[in-house]
């Protein structure tokens, strides 16, 4: 493999001159520059990314810590982040953690060795262990996305899940539904709690009782929606509507309803959350709460780029508000 010394020898210049041509750190005569570039081409020389980063104090790379990239919601956000990084000339190191503190630590250590310019964090839940690990990297420009806590060392994007849960439930109530079930995520996790509390507030404002037998907890997967819906369907009294706290659980719930020879929305209405790309192709097309994944990703990465270039600025909280998307899975009573 060719070295910078080989390039200098072929071009008939010093290694310092080669370095200036590569890093554009000083004026070099046009003829000399062309000789160096031709030598680089002839030798197929590739400058060391690490060595260059030490000189210009940037690696043009971003680390992204996520719970998983498999779920449609996370995948759509990651896609928007990766696309913008690519357009800005940045590499993206994507690290799946499954909320495992050991994995988080190992990934953070790896990203530190890579000398990434900044860090995006998007986890389904933030344990004290993971918060402590992130705190150790407080000097690194960092944006916490979606459900993370705010502290003075990070920027934060909030998705207002409470508002989304409220909007979804109020829409069902406004369409005449009084017997409403909820299929939630784990109620020990922030995003599930916030969406449930929004549901609870809407029910209380309408003076409607919440049936404890219709409060189901899953893990935001389609099989959870399916299993939770089946637990509801074996009860003597059925709800007229179900609020599923994400779209993939709504898909599972719709499947369970169909297997009992019932129809959505004629027999049971279903509303989801997230407005994933596939939700408009459900049968029937799913009424849901829209949380712009592309906007969330773009806001986060732009905020991080801003933090990288203006490290001394006061940290920010940016809020993104959910919106109702009406399709065909909710019946008016």
From Swiss-Prot:
Coiled coil: none annotated. InterPro entries: HTH_LacI, LacI/GalR-like_sensor, Lambda_DNA-bd_dom_sf, Peripla_BP_I, Tscrpt_reg_HTH_PurR. It holds the Pfam family LacI. It comes from the Bacteria. Pathway: Purine metabolism; purine nucleotide biosynthesis [regulation]. Hypoxanthine binds at residues 73, 189, 191, 220, 274. GO terms for biological process: negative regulation of DNA-templated transcription; purine nucleotide biosynthetic process. Residues 4-23, 48-56 bind DNA. Residues 2-56 form the HTH lacI-type domain. GO terms for molecular function: DNA-binding transcription factor activity; transcription cis-regulatory region binding. Keywords: DNA-binding, Purine biosynthesis, Repressor, Transcription, Transcription regulation. The keyword ATP-binding does not apply. The keyword Phosphoprotein does not apply. Is the main repressor of the genes involved in the de novo synthesis of purine nucleotides, regulating purB, purC, purEK, purF, purHD, purL, purMN and guaBA expression. PurR is allosterically activated to bind its cognate DNA by binding the purine corepressors, hypoxanthine or guanine, thereby effecting transcription repression. HAMAP family: HTH_type_PurR. Homodimer. Consists of two structural and functional domains: an N-terminal DNA-binding domain, approximately the first 60 residues, and a larger C-terminal domain, approximately 280 residues, which imparts the function of corepressor binding and oligomerization. This is HTH-type transcriptional repressor PurR. It comes from Histophilus somni (strain 2336). The lineage of its organism: Bacteria, Pseudomonadati, Pseudomonadota, Gammaproteobacteria, Pasteurellales.
